[in-house]
């Protein structure tokens, strides 16, 4: 079966594993998913990420992060630009998520960036997801 939206699948897998407090999860790899996982790690939403090469496309292993008393670090993930309705933002219209408490993941001509990085580089692009 062909997957129509692999980014939504990745976010759903992370959301579901986070809800049941799994320590790690595995996601089929792609270049875009790797970049999104690296952003989540860099911004402190996940503990670690590793890339496992296999005979097919590879696997991204995501290690989820929890706070004291096993509370979730990721409270929400939302796919914004979908295959049926793409959402773009100009460089001066890059969205803020919860007044800066969350991040927007944006695919720009300069690579996949957070909303803060896109504002600093004055780059617009496709708004992939919100994470808070």
Curated annotation (Swiss-Prot):
One of its GO terms (molecular function) is rRNA binding. Gene3D superfamilies: 3.30.1370.30, 3.30.1490.10. The keyword Repeat does not apply. It comes from the Bacteria. One of its GO terms (cellular component) is cytosolic small ribosomal subunit. The keyword RNA-binding applies. One of its GO terms (biological process) is translation. It holds the Pfam family Ribosomal_S8. Keywords: Ribonucleoprotein, Ribosomal protein, RNA-binding, rRNA-binding. Part of the 30S ribosomal subunit. Contacts proteins S5 and S12. Belongs to the universal ribosomal protein uS8 family. One of the primary rRNA binding proteins, it binds directly to 16S rRNA central domain where it helps coordinate assembly of the platform of the 30S subunit. This is Small ribosomal subunit protein uS8. It comes from Bacillus subtilis (strain 168).
